Amino acid sequence: MAKLLYIKANPKSDQSSRTFIISEHFIKVYKEFHPNDQIITLDLYKEGIHFLSQEDINDIFAPKTEASKHHPILKYAYQFLEADKYVFAAPMWNLGIPAILKAYIDYITVSGITFKYTEQGAVGLLRGKKAVHIMATGGEYKTPPFSDFEMANRYLKTILGFMGVEDFQTITAQRLDIVGEDVEKIISNALKEAEEIAKRF
């Protein structure tokens, strides 16, 4: 039985968020094809994720003990470590990821838990795990010059790669706010892509 961590980074409801419309469909299909897997939903806004304080930073860099697994910040890093698969439902906001997702990433990118330092430098500890990022965008960022502006999916792929996650896929619904676009068709195509990836994820 695999453990999937479903991370939601949008204050909108499942019905009003275009990202969540796609991600919820992904999860629905995933459940159908992986009925024995455990799915843990982590809504970052409901969790009350905040920016790290000086005290938090001190705790993160302190030696890890058995009690660290129950620390209010470090518990998220251990939860991330224990999962086998990750689904990130996070829209693009102003070319990047929502700030709350960046704050969460600061919670989980912890030396001694999700990566470690060696004589050769940093080494990720999440080898063999896989992730998918589901993202809706108002504009189009697949081709130049706008592809250079895209710093949401690229960042997420990079930081997860730093932690050892090499199997990374992306499902995007782009051009949703461009005048004249068929939004229903764009979302429909994204739902179909999500369905196919969910079956084999």
Curated annotation (Swiss-Prot):
EC numbers on record: 1.6.5.-, 1.7.1.17
Catalytic reaction equation(s): 2 a quinone + NADH + H(+) = 2 a 1,4-benzosemiquinone + NAD(+); N,N-dimethyl-1,4-phenylenediamine + anthranilate + 2 NAD(+) = 2-(4-dimethylaminophenyl)diazenylbenzoate + 2 NADH + 2 H(+)
Binding site for FMN: 92-95
InterPro entries per record: Flavodoxin_fold, Flavoprotein-like_sf, FMN-dep_NADH:Q_OxRdtase_AzoR1, NADH:quinone_OxRdtase_FMN_depd
Pfam families attached to this UniProt entry: Flavodoxin_2
SUPFAM superfamilies, per database record: Flavoproteins
Entry function: Quinone reductase that provides resistance to thiol-specific stress caused by electrophilic quinones. Also exhibits azoreductase activity. Catalyzes the reductive cleavage of the azo bond in aromatic azo compounds to the corresponding amines.
Protein name: FMN-dependent NADH:quinone oxidoreductase
Species in which this protein is naturally found: Caldicellulosiruptor saccharolyticus (strain ATCC 43494 / DSM 8903 / Tp8T 6331)
